[in-house]
């Protein structure tokens, strides 16, 4: 969830409660923490939560972890249901059912708060996570793959006393890694089966930006005095936590907390400081590239007042030129990774959506735009090689929700249609044969589907040279054949075998 304004054109209207902790002296260097923890910490418990008193049901088999390809391998990543995901607020009791019925494969929760589990040094209160545990069980039973954010330092562990969202004190790091190790041991197995761990949320935010938000759901590791905005310190933390998480579960996936990437640091903006977006570079310059599996980032567009029109001025991104801002951010991340020769990392956009930012009333044009944005953002994510694209959120922020007061929106319907039409298909290529029309081709076996729309909204002539089996629009409405014109409404065009 983004917490900053953006520049836009004028159009934008263990089983025990006691944690066994290594006895490290105050001031011990972080770099010594991994060795010390490995030598002094208790063995990983072989059991997890206390067994329920009710009769036992058969233990479900662990859910397979999707094989995620590096982000550059567009064309080999299976899309459709395998990359769709939705974030759900922990208070949303019926959220799991709605995510499943939307056809999503991922569910994201924010999150597990260290301060709630260990408010006092060494004293664990896992019972504080009862609601989260219920949601994790529901997700596993529904066959959803969970991305779980871990955040929130207790007061005794904070570098900045007033900021739970900020960095951890060096002398508390040993306690943190043992907490993470025990957390993974507890929740990586049935009945929870969590495999994806996101370390903080939006760490590239300065503490000053969220100073008035108690227990901020954002991260705030950002250091304005540092050339790389504190990324090096976050990278140092990854070096410590990564081996301990892997020791608890070798299949665990450690994801850099969803980078906000507020604006493009390569483009000077007189009214905007883009130093925060150098956070990732700071991680890599400090040698953090070997201590994570994937990168999570966030990419929101802003409604520009007319159906199908949106953009993000901070990245010079607009609907009819660059498409969704996730494309610009994905390419930026790939560029930074390449500059530092870091390979084999997958990318997940863990917060996507189009916002009616600070709208007093929500026009119907926005709801139409949000619905159209679903196939556009997912097709673009596939073309850019993302391994996941998580809608924020089920209930929404700045009107981005797929539900509105527990009622489905047009965007929810569009989400279901995408899942049905592109289920388990592979992205093949972008077809550039028709001027002014975006066409992305997907394939499974001998089934071929084009996702297509007029890029600038103009009514464009189109002559499909191959036989067409059927056409439906973004909301699943059948369209007559033959197709001769196309507008801003995204279409699913299934070709004859």
PLM regions and their residue ranges:
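Carbohydrate-binding surface patches
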Residues: 433-467, 474-476
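Ser/Thr-rich, Proline-interspersed low-complexity disordered segments
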Residues: 3-77, 464
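Conserved, mostly hydrophobic/aromatic
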Residues: 107, 139, 183, 197, ...
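Noncatalytic carbohydrate-binding groove/subsite architecture in carbohydrate-active enzymes
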Residues: 229-373, 384
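C-terminal beta-strand-rich structural cap/linker in extracellular carbohydrate-active enzymes
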Residues: 479-497
């Amino acid at each position: 969830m983004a917490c900053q304004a953006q520049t836009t054109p004028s159009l934008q209207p263990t089983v025990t409660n006691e944690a066994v902790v290594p006895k490290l002296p105050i001031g011990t260097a972080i770099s010594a923490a991994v060795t010390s923890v490995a030598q002094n910490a208790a063995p990983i418990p072989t059991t997890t939560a206390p067994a329920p008193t009710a009769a036992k049901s058969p233990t479900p088999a662990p859910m397979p972890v999707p094989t995620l390809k590096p982000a550059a391998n567009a064309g080999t990543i299976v899309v459709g249901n395998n990359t769709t995901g939705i974030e759900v607020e922990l208070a949303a009791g019926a959220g799991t059912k709605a995510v499943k019925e939307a056809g999503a494969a991922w569910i994201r929760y924010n999150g597990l708060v260290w301060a709630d589990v260990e408010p006092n040094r060494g004293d664990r209160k896992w019972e504080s996570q009862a609601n989260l545990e219920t949601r994790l069980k529901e997700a596993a039973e529904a066959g959803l793959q969970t991305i779980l954010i871990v955040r929130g330092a207790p007061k005794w562990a904070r570098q900045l006393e007033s900021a739970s969202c900020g960095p951890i004190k060096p002398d508390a790091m040993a306690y943190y890694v043992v907490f993470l190790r025990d957390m993974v041991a507890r929740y990586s197995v049935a009945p929870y089966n969590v495999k994806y761990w996101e370390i903080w949320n939006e760490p590239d935010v300065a503490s000053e930006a969220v100073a008035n938000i108690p227990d901020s759901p954002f991260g705030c590791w950002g250091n304005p005095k540092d050339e790389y905005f504190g990324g090096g310190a976050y990278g140092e933390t990854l070096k410590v936590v990564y081996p301990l998480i892997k020791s608890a579960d070798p299949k665990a996936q450690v994801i850099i907390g969803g980078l906000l990437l507020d604006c493009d640091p390569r483009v000077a903006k007189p009214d905007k400081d883009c130093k925060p977006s150098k956070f990732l570079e700071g991680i890599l310059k400090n040698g953090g590239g070997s201590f994570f599996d994937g990168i999570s980032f966030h990419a929101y567009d802003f409604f520009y007042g007319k159906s199908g029109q949106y953009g993000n001025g901070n990245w010079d991104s607009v609907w009819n030129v660059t498409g969704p801002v996730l494309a610009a951010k994905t390419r930026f991340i790939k560029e930074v990774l390449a500059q530092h020769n870091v390979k084999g990392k997958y990318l997940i956009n863990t917060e996507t959506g189009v916002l009616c930012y600070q709208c007093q009333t929500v026009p119907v044009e926005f709801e139409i735009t949000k619905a159209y944005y679903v196939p556009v953002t997912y097709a673009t994510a596939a073309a850019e090689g993302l391994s996941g694209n998580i809608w924020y959120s089920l209930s929404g922020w700045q009107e981005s929700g797929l539900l509105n007061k527990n009622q489905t929106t047009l965007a929810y319907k569009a989400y279901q249609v995408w899942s049905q039409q592109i289920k388990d298909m592979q992205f093949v290529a972008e077809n550039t044969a028709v001027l002014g029309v975006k066409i992305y081709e997907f394939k499974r076996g001998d089934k071929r589907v084009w996702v297509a729309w007029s890029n600038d909204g103009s009514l464009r002539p189109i002559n499909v040279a191959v036989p067409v089996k059927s056409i439906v629009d973004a909301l699943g409405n059948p369209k007559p054949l033959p197709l001769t014109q196309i507008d801003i409404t995204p279409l699913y065009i299934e070709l004859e075998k």
